[in-house]
Curated annotation (Swiss-Prot):
Pfam families: Pan_kinase. It comes from Alkaliphilus metalliredigens (strain QYMF). This is Type III pantothenate kinase. It catalyses: (R)-pantothenate + ATP = (R)-4'-phosphopantothenate + ADP + H(+). Homodimer.
Length: 268
């Protein structure tokens, strides 16, 4: 089985794949202060709680936007699985032609999402990822990564409002029934949630115009708060909560032959 690991600024999501089918997945908090031993114990416990054996993992692929965590995490995986994990970056085959001024600047998570979205839904398309940052990525009909937009995530905006405005409380990210609100809490919730709906609709519509194509441009959303925003807009066609994990599985398969050769050599 293949373990795929998506390291984000807020959460680490792990998925276990067998023959490209998701067997199980787990979500843990990203913590740069955790040691490799702590990560090793935590990951092993996740497997045990699910009735799985970590020793069934043949190989591991990681996508990360948090460089400071990689030493501890990679060391933990080497210890648990006895493999050197494949890390998405330069030299890893993705099948995506990146049309960025500096391709190295594109976050691994954005590339992984693009791979999965184009494979599953074709192009042209826009991928919106509601993570710590909200990212919008444009992929052409030929599977080229054209570029995109990065904006503060919904939770970042909510936390900033609480931290910078002395009289405003921290609020739960839920959708109030209207925008003419009668309390401070519901007023903040309406501003955050419906404000983000407006942001998403505007950027998606502007991106579609910049594509300058006649064919339909599909919009695929992923990330923890994608369902919340999707419930208030018509501009999202598909919500795919496992998009990043599937992208990692696909990228692994595109590098499988080379990986198998490396693993065989290391075991010789």
């Amino acid at each position: 089985m293949i373990l795929v690991v998506d390291v984000g600024n807020t959460n680490i999501v792990l998925g276990l794949y067998e023959k490209q089918e998701l067997v199980d997945f787990w979500r843990i908090s990203t913590d740069e202060d955790k040691s490799s031993d702590e990560y090793s114990v935590l990951i092993n416990q996740l497997f045990q709680y699910s009735g799985l054996n970590i020793k069934t993992v043949e190989d591991v692929i990681i996508s990360s936007v948090v460089p400071n965590i990689m030493y501890s995490l990679e060391h933990a995986i080497r210890k648990l699985c006895n493999v050197e994990p494949l890390v998405v970056g330069p030299g890893v085959k993705t099948g995506i032609n990146i049309k960025y001024d500096n391709p190295k600047q594109v976050g691994a998570d954005r590339i992984v999402n693009a791979v999965a979205a184009f494979e599953k839904y074709g192009g042209p398309l826009i991928v919106v990822d509601f993570g710590t940052a909200t990212t919008f990525c444009a992929i052409s009909g030929h599977g080229e990564y054209l570029g995109g937009t990065i904006s503060p995530g919904i939770k970042i905006a909510s936390d900033a409002l609480f931290q910078r405005a002395a009289k405003l409380p921290r609020v739960e990210l839920v959708k109030p029934g209207k925008v003419i609100c009668k309390s401070t809490v519901s007023s903040m919730q309406a501003g955050i949630v419906y404000g983000y709906v407006g942001l998403v609709e505007y950027i998606v519509n502007k991106m579609k115009k910049e594509f300058n194509v006649r064919s339909k441009i599909k919009v695929v959303a992923t990330g923890g708060l994608s369902t919340l925003i999707d419930s208030e807009t018509q501009c999202i066609d598909v919500v795919d909560k496992f998009l990043t994990l599937e992208g990692l599985s696909l990228i692994y398969e595109r590098n499988r032959q080379e990986r198998q050769a490396i693993l065989k050599e290391s075991q010789a």
